[in-house]
Design a protein with these regions (language model features):
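Short beta-strand element of the alpha/beta-hydrolase
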Residues: 29, 39-49
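Short amphipathic alpha-helix adjacent to the substrate-entry channel of hydrolases
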Residues: 57-75
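Alpha/beta-hydrolase active-site loop
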Residues: 84-105
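Short beta-strand/loop motif that positions the catalytic acidic residue
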Residues: 216, 222-224, 228
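Conserved alpha/beta-hydrolase "acid-adjacent" motif
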Residues: 229-238
């Protein structure tokens, strides 16, 4: 089914386990399914929360609205930084894309059209996921095997597009901004997630591009508030120009 944003569908909301972390916590997937013939394009929602907070419920009003327009929206829990630092949550996102490619048809989703939405720190995760879909650090969590002891399906984590709201495209710049504004909680969130601290460079989308790493380029839509004093518009504009170069 081609996507028509002016369409209106009733939706059904359900939840299923995504996977269990090394610490024993079950990460859940919250599925917003349009009622209609489909199959519907799939959108994976990666929540914000400065890598340390929030869960699959964070963007529920938006998820419901998008699903009612004809998208199969799947919002997931991710490993939070106090449980495990970078790259754990990127591994969760990579796993979720592969999991959706295998399972989306169960909810009338078109597994050939998987896009990603990320808000704030979720946008940072989305950028890394999209730019490095086959990175062995990110795809380290295997899919479960098929029925009857069959091997897990062979799919990758490439995505069709990424839409983001105020993504942390340069986490070092946001950390420095927090230092300048004396925002201790935000500073601490960075320190917990980027452990060891040098990982703030390795996992920095702006620096990845400046290092001319070999990355996968997919369409990015970035929505950035002009008065945002958390993710500065000028920093975002620099990232966009670098990504387009």
């Amino acid at each position: 089914t081609s996507y028509n944003p002016s369409a209106k569908f009733d939706i059904t909301v359900s939840e299923v386990p995504l996977r269990t972390t090394a610490a024993g916590r079950t990460l859940m997937a919250r599925i917003y399914q349009p009622s209609g013939p489909g199959p519907f394009p799939v959108l994976l929602d990666l929540h914000g929360g400065a890598w340390n907070n929030k869960d699959r419920h964070a963007e529920e009003p938006m998820d419901r609205a998008l699903a009612s327009s004809g998208l199969l929206v799947v919002a997931i829990d991710m490993t939070l930084a106090p449980e495990a630092p970078y790259p754990a949550c990127v591994q969760d996102a990579n796993f979720a894309v592969r999991w959706l490619k295998v399972n989306a048809a169960k909810w009338n989703g078109d597994a050939s059209k998987v896009g990603v939405y990320g808000s704030s720190s979720g946008g940072h995760v989305a950028e890394l996921l999209a730019m490095r879909p086959r990175d062995p650090r990110y795809n380290a969590i295997p899919l479960p095997g098929g029925p009857g002891g069959n091997a897990a399906p062979k799919v990758d984590a490439t995505v069709a597009f990424v839409a983001m709201r105020s993504p942390v495209s340069n986490p070092l710049a946001r950390f420095q901004n927090a230092v300048d504004l004396k925002r201790e909680p935000m500073m601490n969130n960075h320190k917990v997630f980027f452990s060891p601290w040098d990982s703030i460079h390795e996992s920095n989308p702006q620096e990845i591009l400046e290092r001319h790493e070999k990355v996968t380029f997919v369409p990015f839509l970035i929505m950035q508030g002009a008065l945002d004093d958390n993710v500065r518009p000028a920093v975002q504009e620099t990232f966009v120009k670098t990504y387009q170069a």
